[in-house]
């Protein structure tokens, strides 16, 4: 009997290979070309286009073990993880699929054969459900599989009818259920298959996609019905191994053992501890796989879900007594258990570990402070007899301390409290509105309906500017002016010109559009920019500098060659830099944006931390070494599928056509790219990285220059060095040493100044003490002093308080057109007088506000001329 999780996984795939299925590897957790999904959450996701008839995969039967995440979005199990035996954020789904090949009879027969003969589950424990109107499936189960009629249950559309959407492919489904026995679940005598307890476990769902539903709800039979099945590996392992929880299987045993060693909390001894142990075990798998598939923690989208999962695990670690980062230490355990099935994890082990550690450290910085505030709020609510954490508190924890809302809800759950979700959303909307008001960007321009109209009329442009072509002849097919079609453009008029064929590159993929001229008989049009509003349309934007251009005119198109060559050099350099970065820093580097101009290049990429200077130097040196090798830059046009098999780097989420250009630079770089490039790497000349920065969570940017601009940059830097060296009267090569000495001298002098200030303050404080007056038995000292900043004023006040021993002090100073006030109350008087209350009453005298503790408070205001009046006000208060 097969029991081990790894054996079940392999036996399933091998079984269906024996039934003529192609074994298909798991797809990424990031759904390809499907913006409707946050994560891959089922085995059928990667086959969606095959089911819709939009893709021919070359096989009609498939079997897979798909990694899935259900957290965030429509399918969200996050808040239940840890509290139940079955919920997971990450799990593996076994599935077999038919694209217009076999149907119900085979799907049912093979499912039954696998469970009863391969896994050897007892037949008497298995139940099935069918859609209430699916007589065909009912007969197959009853007559061919010989399942007793009392163990075949007909259910309605809600339970047993699957739909891809409101319209489109749909069909009935049949679920195979395992009865764990009377000793499991609610224990009620009337317990049945639809009871919410744990007795009856759904193991396998067989979906028979046989209809097309229209907007009126009418079902039309599909010409080629499909099969889509799904079975959770973790759940099947629990049944096969005879345990009551997925977490008790061998799939989780190594992780739980490792967590128990780290925390000193054995699994199975204390239910509260067990919840946290299960949370950490599940989340350790999720974060490893999500990061491995290229997702980084951030405050939006998939990155935010990852952050929520990771921080929830960190918080449960704290409940188990872990006050230091620990989750990253579980990465090797996850990878060791999964490396045979997902070998790419092994290559990314170091990277995944670093990302997790970095995020743990960030959260640890704010976790304690946030927990303290939340605990104070919980105590306050309990005293008040209320049970809901206000939305503004939830928002503050989210905005200031990085607590996702579900983490806050999870924490207060133990105190039987809930959070005000609506109040939180209102606070979020206020913040969004402020952001909208302060945003000055123009946003993405909508594609003009005019371009769409031209396209439907059959007007298109073929780009002929690859392979260094900068000249071509063509014919004007359309002229536009102020978003209107015109028949001609006259001298001095601005507009857009469209031709049948052009060597001008229209801005797309980060490469800017070309400039140049378009010339006809007694007509010259200056091209100031070239755009690509549609895939098949290129627009030349500019003005007529001579004559008149008309629709139908024959023209000669001349690209500004120097600018094009410089742009090409920067584009090719971007490819080299990406390849160099992958070599130096790891294959997790993925392009998330770029800009290529004639002057410079900008490359945005996924990475979790600042690139150190030595790493930048390695990247630059490696790229320049490839330039010196003068490798040929070869471009091939291939079908997309064939191109992807070559291992060429592709931009994630980029929409590619059926055929793509593959740009190869020797053995160093290979990318899918539709832009223009130089002929050999030596044409780039030289790359110089000039800046590296963070532009968003998990996204960084490199800026660089090449060729002549790189030389100009080096020359500017050299001139600045010479200028600084001349001022300091040293050689440029000794400049660093000289600056270090100057900084040390400055620090020494600053220390000396502080020492002198302290001595003067001590002397002044001794002199001022004689001015203290006794009012109602309390020594009160008020004085205007010479303090250039708040720190000096505080230092001076501390010395006065130490010497006064008992009393109230109010001192003030004028600096940079403002008044500063400091109030101090010695500890023996803080039960009668509060420095904070005193300063709040006096601050308005100088036009300001203030506050602080009972023993010390400060204020500032824009009316220094009222300082003396403010100081006298203290005596009146006492």
Curated annotation (Swiss-Prot):
Positions of Zn(2+) binding: 571, 575, 673, 677
Molecular function GO terms recorded: alanine-tRNA ligase activity; aminoacyl-tRNA deacylase activity; ATP binding; tRNA binding; zinc ion binding
Cofactor stoichiometry and binding remark: Binds 1 zinc ion per subunit.
Cofactor(s) required for function per UniProt: Zn(2+)
Cellular compartment(s): Cytoplasm
GO CC list: cytosol
Chief location of this protein within or outside the cell: cytoplasm
Keywords linked to the UniProt accession: Aminoacyl-tRNA synthetase, ATP-binding, Cytoplasm, Ligase, Metal-binding, Nucleotide-binding, Protein biosynthesis, RNA-binding, tRNA-binding, Zinc
SMART domains for this protein: tRNA_SAD (SM00863)
Stored Pfam families: DHHA1 (PF02272), tRNA-synt_2c (PF01411), tRNA_SAD (PF07973)
SUPFAM superfamilies xref list: Class II aaRS and biotin synthetases, Putative anticodon-binding domain of alanyl-tRNA synthetase (AlaRS), ThrRS/AlaRS common domain, Translation proteins
Catalysed reactions listed for this entry: tRNA(Ala) + L-alanine + ATP = L-alanyl-tRNA(Ala) + AMP + diphosphate
EC number: 6.1.1.7
Enzymatic class: ligase
Iron-sulfur as UniProt keyword: no
GO biological process terms, semicolon-separated: alanyl-tRNA aminoacylation; negative regulation of DNA-templated transcription
Functional note: Catalyzes the attachment of alanine to tRNA(Ala) in a two-step reaction: alanine is first activated by ATP to form Ala-AMP and then transferred to the acceptor end of tRNA(Ala). Also edits incorrectly charged Ser-tRNA(Ala) and Gly-tRNA(Ala) via its editing domain.
Domain comment, as recorded: Consists of three domains; the N-terminal catalytic domain, the editing domain and the C-terminal C-Ala domain. The editing domain removes incorrectly charged amino acids, while the C-Ala domain, along with tRNA(Ala), serves as a bridge to cooperatively bring together the editing and aminoacylation centers thus stimulating deacylation of misacylated tRNAs.
HAMAP family: Ala_tRNA_synth_B
Family assignment from sequence similarity: Belongs to the class-II aminoacyl-tRNA synthetase family.
Stated name of the protein: Alanine--tRNA ligase
Species per Swiss-Prot/TrEMBL record: Syntrophus aciditrophicus (strain SB)
């Amino acid at each position: 009997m097969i029991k081990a999780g790894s054996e079940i996984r392999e036996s399933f795939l091998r079984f269906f290979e024996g039934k003529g299925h192609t074994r298909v590897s798991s797809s990424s957790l990031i759904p390809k070309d499907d913006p409707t999904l946050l994560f891959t959450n089922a085995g059928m996701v990667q086959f969606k286009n095959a089911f819709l008839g939009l893709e021919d995969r070359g096989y009609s039967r498939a079997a897979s073990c798909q990694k899935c995440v259900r957290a965030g979005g429509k399918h969200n199990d996050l808040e239940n993880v840890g509290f139940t035996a079955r919920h997971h954020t990450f799990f593996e789904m076994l599935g077999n699929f038919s694209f217009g090949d076999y149907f119900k009879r085979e799907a049912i027969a093979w499912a039954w054969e696998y469970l009863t003969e391969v896994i050897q589950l007892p037949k008497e424990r298995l139940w099935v459900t069918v859609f209430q109107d699916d007589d065909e499936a009912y007969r197959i189960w009853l007559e061919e599989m010989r399942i007793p009629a009392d163990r075949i249950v007909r259910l309605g559309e809600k339970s047993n009818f699957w739909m891809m959407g409101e319209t489109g492919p749909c069909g009935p489904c049949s679920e195979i259920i395992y009865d764990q026995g009377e000793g499991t679940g609610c224990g009620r005598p009337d317990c049945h298959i639809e009871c919410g307890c744990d007795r009856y476990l759904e193991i396998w769902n067989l979906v028979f996609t046989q209809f097309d539903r229209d907007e009126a709800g009418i079902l039309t039979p599909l010409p080629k019905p499909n099969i889509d099945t799904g079975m959770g590996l973790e759940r099947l392992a629990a049944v096969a191994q005879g345990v009551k929880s997925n977490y008790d299987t061998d799939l989780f045993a190594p992780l739980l053992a490792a967590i128990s060693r780290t925390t000193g909390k054995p699994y199975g001894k204390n239910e509260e501890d067990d919840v946290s142990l299960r949370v950490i075990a599940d989340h350790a798998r999720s974060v490893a796989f999500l990061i491995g598939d290229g997702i980084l923690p951030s405050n939006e989208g998939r990155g935010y879900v990852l952050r929520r999962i990771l921080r929830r695990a960190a918080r449960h670690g704290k409940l188990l007594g872990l006050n230091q980062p620990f989750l990253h230490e579980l990465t090797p355990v996850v990878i060791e258990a999964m490396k045979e099935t997902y070998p790419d994890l092994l290559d990314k082990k170091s990277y995944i570990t670093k990302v997790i550690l970095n995020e743990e450290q960030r959260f640890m910085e704010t976790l304690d402070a946030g927990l303290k505030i939340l605990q104070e709020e919980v105590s306050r609510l309990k005293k008040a007899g209320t049970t809901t954490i206000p939305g503004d508190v939830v928002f503050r924890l989210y905005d200031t301390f990085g607590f996702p809302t579900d983490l806050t809800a999870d924490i207060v759950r133990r105190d039987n409290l809930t959070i005000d979700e609506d109040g939180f959303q209102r606070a979020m909307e206020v913040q969004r509105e402020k952001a909208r008001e302060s945003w000055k960007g123009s946003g993405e321009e909508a594609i003009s309906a005019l371009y769409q109209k031209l396209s439907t009329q059959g007007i298109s442009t073929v780009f002929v500017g690859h392979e260094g072509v900068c000249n071509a002849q063509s014919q004007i097919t359309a002229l536009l002016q102020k978003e209107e079609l015109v028949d001609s453009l006259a001298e001095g008029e601005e507009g857009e010109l469209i031709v049948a064929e052009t060597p001008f590159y229209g801005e797309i993929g980060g490469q800017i559009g070309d400039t140049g001229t378009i010339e006809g008989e007694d007509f010259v049009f200056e091209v100031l920019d070239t755009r690509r509003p549609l895939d098949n349309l290129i627009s030349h934007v500019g003005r007529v500098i001579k004559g008149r251009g008309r629709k139908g005119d024959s023209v000669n198109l001349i690209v500004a060659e120097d600018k094009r060559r410089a742009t090409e050099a920067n584009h090719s350099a971007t490819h080299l830099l990406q390849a160099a970065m992958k070599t130096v820093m790891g294959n997790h580097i993925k392009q998330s944006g770029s800009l290529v101009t004639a002057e410079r290049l900008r490359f945005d990429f996924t990475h979790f931390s600042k690139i150190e200077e030595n790493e930048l130097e390695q990247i630059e040196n490696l790229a320049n070494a490839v330039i010196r090798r003068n490798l040929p830059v070869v471009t091939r046009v291939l079908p997309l599928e064939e191109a992807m098999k070559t291992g060429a780097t592709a931009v994630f989420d980029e929409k590619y056509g059926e055929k793509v250009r593959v740009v190869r630079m020797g053995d160093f770089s290979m990318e899918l790219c539709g832009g223009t490039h130089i002929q050999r790497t030596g044409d780039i000349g030289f790359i110089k990285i000039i800046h590296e920065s963070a532009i968003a969570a998990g996204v960084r940017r490199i800026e660089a220059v090449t060729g002549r601009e790189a030389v100009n940059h080096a020359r500017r830097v050299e001139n600045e060095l010479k200028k600084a060296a001349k001022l300091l009267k040293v050689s440029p090569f000794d400049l660093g040493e000289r600056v270090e000495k100057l900084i040390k001298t400055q620090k020494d002098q600053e220390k000396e100044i502080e020492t002198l200030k302290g001595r003067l303050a001590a002397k002044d404080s001794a002199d001022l003490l004689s001015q203290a007056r006794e009012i109602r038995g309390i020594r009160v000292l008020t004085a205007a002093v010479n303090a250039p900043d708040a720190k000096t004023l505080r230092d001076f006040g501390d010395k006065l308080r130490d010497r006064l021993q008992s009393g109230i002090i109010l001192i003030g100073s004028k600096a940079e057109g403002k008044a500063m006030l400091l109030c101090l109350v010695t500890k023996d008087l803080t039960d009668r007088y509060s420095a904070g209350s005193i300063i709040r009453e006096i601050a308005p005298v100088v036009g300001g506000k203030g506050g602080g503790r009972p023993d010390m408070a400060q204020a500032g205001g824009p009316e220094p001329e009222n300082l003396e009046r403010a100081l006298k006000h203290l005596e009146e208060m006492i």
